[in-house]
């Protein structure tokens, strides 16, 4: 969360607006991602909300930005957060404004263990057949509290397909207001949990 605050008086002719400064901060964050991080070190910096003012003929006192940062490692996450905080604090100063950061640390990166992922794969193939298991081609920046468990224990975070039949490739994502869930998939999810437990107990991995 970032707050850009005007420091000048109330006369519009001499008051700097935080709106263009907020836009500059947004652009600088995108440049930070592409210039300070390797393409082999994926990061995401999303400005999901900008709020400033209440009408079109009054210069607002403040501009607020809500920003989400994600990465595939803890070290990269810290570098990204540090870089974004520096931009928010320094760019407004060049315009006579003040930038404040309220950093709320979310969940750490969700990183599977190879052994845990192998258990899930074996259980899924045994329960659903080879066609019922699919390895994701690229890493997914999941933000999950399960990541805390993965920091301490061997395990894996897996997805359960819940798209209604006949909608593969066309179904809305789970965070969409158009999402439709095949409720029969819940039975598959329960069976998968049981299959994973049995796979571990049988010592097949």
Question: Where are these predicted regions, by residue range?
Answer:
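Single conserved hydrophobic/aromatic residue that forms the stacking wall/gate
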Residues: 1-9, 13-14
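Metal-dependent amide/peptide-bond hydrolase catalytic core
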Residues: 19-205
